């Protein structure tokens, strides 16, 4: 029974298989499956042939470079860099691709070949870093040296000119003062030297007790002594007329900033325009006789009458001349000075009284002008003695 049952089942399976195949063929599915299987088999066979006949990847330029000594040195430096920082994955790709699985040098051999000396047990970084540092030092070495030379050249020239200028400016001033000192005549009095020192001061008020004002007023009172003083001043004026361009030494002094007063009155002389500049230059060292009338001892105030003012001024001048005579200034050579002055001067014969009267008239005119302008605080009288030539002199009255 069992055998018959198995035979029946086998027949039924065969019928079902045939029925399935027939159904698949009728629908076209079976043929499509057969074609796909056949294509897959053919593709597998083709792929197998390609893999067997495939050539290895080779970079010809890299291969030629690595065949040289420098090429192997560079590849060894890169491999040492990757090994120093434990870049294993990158190293696993680098070595097969460059075909450098073997033949690369270690760190010690590289350091010896490059001339890098390392202390035992001390590793500061990869050898590639040390090579770059040495290249930078070689590049910066000449430039820094040139820069140092340039800096020395830049800073050194200014020092030498400064030294030269300082050496030149100091002696340039000394000969000027020495030259002026040598050009002074030996016959100059002590009072004249003090008068020259007084010219550098802005406040030139005259007092009766100072020998400076005594010597300057002595020039106004005695005509004979004026001749000797003017002869000495003329020599200084001629010498200093050539030194007039050196006006830098005169800067800073208020006396030289004031304009030179114009002469208002002359006494019996003729003007010579050619020598006027020299005569004015001779007055540069003479002190201006600026003094307020109220500052003179015994002089009345400005509110007194005009006649009393003139008389008091004349009395003061006589007093000063007497005091200077008592001090012994200008004595001993008065007769010679009188002879020289009288022989060479072209002045009109005027006595001290006539000159005093003219001074009194000038003072009266000046006081009238001051009274009309309501400026009665101070009156400054500048009596300047100068000489336009060797044979003439004049007096200036400046309010």
Swiss-Prot record:
Residues 70-102 form the LisH domain. GO terms for molecular function: protein homodimerization activity; protein kinase binding; protein tyrosine kinase inhibitor activity. Ubiquitous. Highly expressed in heart, liver, muscle, kidney, intestine, colon, adrenal gland, prostate, testis, and pancreas. InterPro entries: FOP_dimerisation-dom_N, LisH. The modification Phosphotyrosine is found at residue 337. Changing residue 74 to F: Abolishes homodimerization and leads to aggregation. Residues 259-275 have a biased composition (Basic and acidic residues). The record marks 173-174 as: Breakpoint for translocation to form CEP43-FGFR1 or FGFR1-CEP43 fusion proteins. Keywords: Cell projection, Chromosomal rearrangement, Cilium biogenesis/degradation, Cytoplasm, Cytoskeleton, Phosphoprotein. Residues 245-256 have a biased composition (Acidic residues). It is found in: Cytoplasm, Cytoskeleton, Microtubule organizing center, Centrosome; Cytoplasm, Cytoskeleton, Microtubule organizing center, Centrosome, Centriole; Cytoplasm, Cytoskeleton, Cilium basal body. Gene3D superfamilies: 1.20.960.40. The modification Phosphothreonine is found at residues 143, 170, 234. Residues 163-172 have a biased composition (Polar residues). One of its GO terms (cellular component) is perinuclear region of cytoplasm. Disulfide bonds: none annotated. Residues 175-186 have a biased composition (Basic residues). GO terms for biological process: cell projection organization; microtubule anchoring; negative regulation of protein kinase activity; positive regulation of cell growth; positive regulation of cell migration; positive regulation of cell population proliferation. Belongs to the CEP43 family. Required for anchoring microtubules to the centrosomes. Required for ciliation. It is linked to A chromosomal aberration involving CEP43 may be a cause of stem cell myeloproliferative disorder (MPD). Translocation t(6;8)(q27;p11) with FGFR1. MPD is characterized by myeloid hyperplasia, eosinophilia and T-cell or B-cell lymphoblastic lymphoma. In general it progresses to acute myeloid leukemia. The fusion proteins CEP43-FGFR1 or FGFR1-CEP43 may exhibit constitutive kinase activity and be responsible for the transforming activity. Homodimer. Part of a ternary complex that contains CEP350, CEP43 and MAPRE1. Interacts directly with CEP350 and MAPRE1. Interacts with CEP19. Interacts (via N-terminus) with CEP350 (via C-terminus). This is Centrosomal protein 43. It comes from Homo sapiens.
């Amino acid at each position: 029974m069992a055998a018959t049952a198995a035979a029946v089942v086998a027949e039924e399976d065969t019928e079902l298989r045939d029925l399935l195949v027939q159904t698949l063929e009728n629908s076209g599915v079976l043929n499509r499956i057969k074609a796909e299987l056949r294509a897959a088999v053919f593709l597998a066979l083709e792929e197998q042939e390609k893999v067997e006949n495939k050539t290895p990847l080779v970079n010809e330029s890299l291969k030629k470079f690595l065949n040289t000594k420098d090429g192997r040195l560079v590849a060894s430096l890169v491999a040492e860099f990757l090994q120093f920082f434990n870049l294993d994955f990158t190293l696993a790709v680098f070595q097969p691709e460059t075909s450098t699985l073997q033949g690369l040098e270690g760190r010690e051999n590289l350091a010896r070949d490059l001339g890098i000396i390392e202390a035992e047990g001390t590793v500061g970084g990869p050898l590639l870093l040390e090579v770059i540092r040495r290249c930078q030092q070689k590049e910066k070495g000449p430039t820094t040296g040139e820069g140092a030379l340039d800096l020395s050249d830049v800073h050194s020239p200014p020092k030498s000119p400064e030294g030269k200028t300082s050496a030149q400016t100091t002696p340039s001033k000394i000969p000027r003062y020495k030259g002026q000192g040598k050009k002074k005549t030996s016959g100059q009095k002590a009072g004249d030297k003090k008068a020259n020192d007084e010219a550098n001061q802005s406040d030139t008020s005259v007092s009766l007790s100072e020998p400076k004002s005594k010597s300057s007023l002595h020039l106004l009172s005695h005509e004979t002594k004026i001749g000797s003083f003017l002869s000495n001043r003329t020599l200084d004026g001629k010498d200093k007329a050539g030194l007039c361009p050196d006006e830098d030494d005169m800067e800073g002094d208020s006396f030289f900033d004031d304009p030179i007063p114009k002469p208002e009155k002359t006494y019996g002389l003729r003007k010579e325009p050619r020598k006027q500049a020299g005569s004015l230059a001779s007055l540069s060292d003479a002190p201006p006789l600026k003094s307020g009338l109220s500052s003179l001892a015994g002089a009345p105030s400005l509110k007194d009458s005009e006649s009393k003012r003139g008389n008091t001024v004349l009395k003061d001048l006589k007093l000063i001349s007497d005091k200077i005579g008592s001090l012994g200034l200008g004595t001993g050579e008065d007769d010679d000075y009188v002879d020289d002055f009288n022989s060479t001067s072209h002045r009109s014969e005027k006595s001290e009284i006539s000159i005093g009267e003219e001074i009194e008239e000038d003072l009266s005119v000046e006081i009238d002008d001051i009274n009309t302008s309501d400026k009665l605080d101070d009156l400054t009288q500048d009596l300047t003695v100068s000489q336009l030539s060797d044979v003439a002199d004049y007096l200036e009255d400046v309010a």
